[in-house]
Design a protein with these regions (language model features):
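Serine-hydrolase catalytic-loop signature spanning alpha/beta hydrolases and amidase-signature enzymes
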Residues: 21-29, 41
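Short beta-strand element of the alpha/beta-hydrolase
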Residues: 11-18
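Conserved acidic functional residues
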Residues: 19, 88, 278-279
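Flexible "cap/lid" subdomain of the alpha/beta-hydrolase fold that forms the substrate-access gate
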Residues: 1, 6, 13, 26, ...
Length: 281
């Protein structure tokens, strides 16, 4: 696993985790600010992304395995008193790492992320049938249906597109999820970790790992995480973009259910999309 380790070794640790399909490059605007403030900033590339190794089988990229890799890194670096910042899948994986090593974390910042536990069991068969019935559409149609969110299952268009599209266009994914656009150089940077199809197992698999169906293997992990965070009294702060249709409302769930969130000031950033690190730095 590749990771950035910037700032003074004795500084208070900040661990920043990216999601799918980005990498540590996403934090290039934030890292210098944190380092200047005296923090030691650790920014891993999740396995399968960035400069980390890229196992070629989608089955290698289970949620549990990715949590384990992050926990192993934190323990090897012996990080203590961590401020965790997680966005997208970085949030889901990192929050579970907090559950597994709670004494190492001092506070949490959740950014455009969540802990979904699937549709109600009574709706599970319908969700599976809906997924089977939807066509594989082009990227633009996928984005439209994702936002439209018919039956509350629009995310399944995203799942199918990532799993089956002949060309998983990573720059398109990032570009279409920010409000302020990307330069040609930035788009090339997001494409660089994936020179051909053999490198894309992780970004293809991650959407399928999101618990939409109640029988998804990650459901027990995230339910256990909710039990933990419903008793979590350390500071828990939400920073969400107001123009992200994917995670809209997830901040309210965190604030309502987590004791440590109820005494904090939270931010909803105006004109900011899913990848708020790009839109708001």
């Amino acid at each position: 696993m590749h990771y950035l380790d910037e700032g003074p070794v004795g500084g208070e640790a900040v661990v920043c985790l990216h999601g799918q399909p980005t990498w540590s490059y996403l934090y290039r605007k934030m890292v210098p600010v944190l380092v200047k403030a005296g923090y030691r900033v650790i920014v891993p590339d999740l396995v399968g992304f960035g400069r980390s190794d890229k196992p070629t089988k989608r089955s290698n990229h289970s949620v549990q395995r990715h949590i384990g890799w992050i926990v192993e890194l934190i323990e090897q670096l012996d990080l203590q008193n961590i401020t965790f910042f997680g966005q997208d899948w970085g949030g889901l994986i990192g929050l579970c790492a907090v559950v597994d090593t709670p004494d190492r974390f001092a506070r949490v910042v959740a950014a455009n992320t969540g802990l979904p536990v699937g549709v109600p069991e009574a709706m599970n068969d319908f969700a599976h049938q809906y997924y089977d019935s939807i066509p594989l559409v082009n990227a633009n149609e996928m984005a439209i249906n994702l936002v439209k969110n018919e039956n509350g299952l629009g995310f399944l268009y995203w799942v199918k597109w990532c799993a089956e599209t002949p060309d998983l266009d990573v720059p398109f994914v990032v570009r279409s999820s920010v409000m302020h656009g990307l330069t040609e150089g930035e788009q090339k940077a997001y494409a660089a970790p994936f020179p051909d199809e053999n490198y894309k197992a992780a970004p293809r698999q991650f959407p399928s790992n999101v618990p939409i169906m109640s029988d998804n293997p990650a459901v027990p992990l995230f339910k256990e995480a909710w039990k933990f965070f419903e008793a979590f009294k350390k500071p828990f702060i939400c920073i969400f973009g107001d123009s992200d249709p994917v995670t809209a409302g997830r901040d309210n769930e965190f604030i309502r259910r987590i004791p440590g969130a109820q005494t904090q000031k939270h931010q909803q950033l105006k004109g900011v999309g899913h990848f708020l690190q790009e839109d708001a730095g």
